[in-house]
Curated annotation (Swiss-Prot):
GO MF annotation list: ATP binding; glutaminyl-tRNA synthase (glutamine-hydrolyzing) activity
Gene Ontology BP terms: translation
Function: Allows the formation of correctly charged Gln-tRNA(Gln) through the transamidation of misacylated Glu-tRNA(Gln) in organisms which lack glutaminyl-tRNA synthetase. The reaction takes place in the presence of glutamine and ATP through an activated gamma-phospho-Glu-tRNA(Gln).
Entry keywords, A to Z: ATP-binding, Ligase, Nucleotide-binding, Protein biosynthesis
Name of the top EC class for this enzyme: ligase
Catalytic activities: L-glutamyl-tRNA(Gln) + L-glutamine + ATP + H2O = L-glutaminyl-tRNA(Gln) + L-glutamate + ADP + phosphate + H(+)
Entry's Gene Ontology cellular component terms: glutamyl-tRNA(Gln) amidotransferase complex
Highest taxon in the source lineage: Bacteria
Protein name: Glutamyl-tRNA(Gln) amidotransferase subunit A
Species in which this protein is naturally found: Aromatoleum aromaticum (strain DSM 19018 / LMG 30748 / EbN1) (Azoarcus sp. (strain EbN1))
């Protein structure tokens, strides 16, 4: 059961081969046994999980089960969960118990999924390694001296180690796709606005988007189907018909299932900066796509190299505004001693926020300040439009764009902690996708030096999630990279 797909788990639950309570207990016991070495979870909600599992068993007995009824999952600790700690990986919210559920959490509860707890993350989703968490870094299950990626590193590590079959995450500049690549799982960030941000603690509002982790594209498709949908409480939520992202996956197997699919290869993604072992795995995966009938064409994203500087103006600017609400008055950390209100604000924020969060708040405040707004923020927004236009021009000549998800495999804990620029460069292939608001997916495609996973990124046009998932699914039907498990998951 530990390594079963969602389809296999659904069949076992429906056939009464295992109950929801037994399944939840199986994974909860694994968390208790293994998470001390991974630190993938901030909060484990055993009592709440078993209560939800009993309710799921009642639904199954009544013939009212949906695809996710009784399926265990975990939520990134950026999603508000009623009655359960919601920390966002920060001292500022270390004791915050949310009074309501995020829209995503509510949808998955309604679907009957069983939440086992909340996963570790970089503080306020600011980071690429999960080292910025107030609760200590999550560890990569393939090598616990290495990072799992970030900011959704806990969710990725939990799925890779089979502490849960699926997990939610968020992606602002690569925070689902990059950890998916570094831990050898599949992760998808949908088109901006497809998943509601209501109850998802904000970092950069024009970039944040909920996403899904699973062992396979098929598992991600089922989770994303349940997460997506219009929410009037989120002004950026898109009102679109409900979509089943699994709809193309059941087609009969064919010798060349991807015949006619044109894959664009941006020259900017295959230049200097990509590690040799990553390049070898990515090129072998592209050969695999060609063997399935796809053709590859060269495309260009001429402004892609400007994505990181544009992002690190726009995202901190939005963060400086979003995080101004954490002042120690209504909720969150409050300094123990202060002389007046102003000192309470300053001391509470100084004590509650970590170094990277403070760095980004300072940068954001600076670029929005009088005299610098035009020079920095407006210029970054212009670059953002150019990057989006580049993607549209490239996608006019292909169906999906492919390349590496991360320029390297997972690095050792502490290796880049003192060099923010090197840390930021780890998202060089993912950030542009967020700036354009496009859907992106990462799936395992091989291993690099030290038997560390490598991910291939697929990017599509707006609302092409089903196409990306289908392409990844066909690749996974013909390969077994997504079935490889770290020794800790045995």
């Amino acid at each position: 059961m530990i390594n079963a797909s969602l389809t296999e788990l659904r069949a076992a639950l429906d056939a009464r081969k295992i109950s929801s309570v037994e399944l939840a207990t199986l994974f909860l016991d694994r968390i208790e046994r293994l998470d001390a070495s991974l630190n993938a979870f901030i909060t484990v909600d055993r009592d709440g999980a078993l209560e939800a599992a009993r309710a799921a068993d009642a639904r199954i007995a009544a013939g009212d089960a949906g695809p996710l009824t009784g399926i265990p999952l975990a939520h990134k600790d950026v999603f508000c969960t009623e009655g359960v700690l919601t920390t966002c990986g920060s001292k500022m919210l270390a004791n915050f118990v949310s009074p309501y559920d995020a829209h995503v959490v509510s949808l998955l509860k309604t679907a009957g999924a069983v939440s086992l707890g909340k996963t570790n993350m970089d503080e306020f989703a600011m980071g690429s390694s999960n080292e910025n968490s107030h609760f200590g870094p999550a560890k990569n299950p393939w090598d616990t001296t290495r990072i799992p990626g970030g900011s959704s590193g806990g969710s990725a590590a939990a799925v890779a180690a089979r502490l849960v079959p699926i997990a939610t995450g968020t992606d602002t500049g690569g925070s689902v796709r990059q950890p998916a690549a570094l831990t050898g799982v599949t992760g998808i960030k949908p088109t901006y606005g497809v998943v509601s941000r209501y109850g998802m603690i904000a970092y950069a509002s024009s970039l944040d988007q909920g996403g899904a982790f699973g062992a396979s594209a098929a598992d991600c498709a089922q989770l994303l189907t349940a997460m997506a949908g219009f929410d009037p409480r989120d002004s950026t939520s898109l009102e679109r018909p409900a979509e089943d992202y699994s709809r193309e996956l059941a087609a009969p197997a064919a010798a060349r299932p991807l015949a006619g699919l044109r894959i664009g290869l941006p020259k900017e993604f295959f230049g200097a900066g990509m590690a040799d072992d990553v390049r070898a795995a990515v090129e072998a995966a592209l050969d695999g796509y060609r063997a399935l009938g796809a053709t590859t064409v060269d495309v260009s994203l001429p402004n892609a190299q400007l994505a990181i500087p544009a992002y690190y103006v726009i995202a901190p600017a939005e963060a400086s505004s979003n995080l101004s609400r954490f002042d120690g008055v209504r909720y969150g950390h409050r300094a123990a001693e202060y002389r007046d209100l102003a000192e309470m604000y300053s001391k509470s924020r100084a004590e509650g926020f970590g170094a990277e969060v403070k760095r980004r708040i300072l940068v954001g405040t600076y670029v929005l300040s009088h005299g610098y707004y035009d020079a920095y923020y407006l210029q970054a927004q212009k670059l953002r439009r150019l990057i989006a236009q580049d993607f549209q021009a490239a996608l006019a000549g292909c169906d999906v764009i492919a390349g590496p998800t991360s320029p390297t495999t997972a690095w050792t804990i502490g290796e880049k902690s003192d060099d923010p620029v090197q840390m930021y460069l780890s998202d060089i292939y993912t950030i542009a996708v967020n700036l354009a608001g496009l859907p992106g997916l990462s799936h395992p495609c091989g291993f690099g030096a030290g038997e560390l996973p490598v991910g291939l990124q697929l990017v599509g046009d707006y609302f092409s999630e089903a196409r990306l998932l289908n392409a990844a699914h066909r690749f996974q039907q013909a390969s077994d990279w997504h079935l490889r498990r770290p020794a800790i998951a045995a």
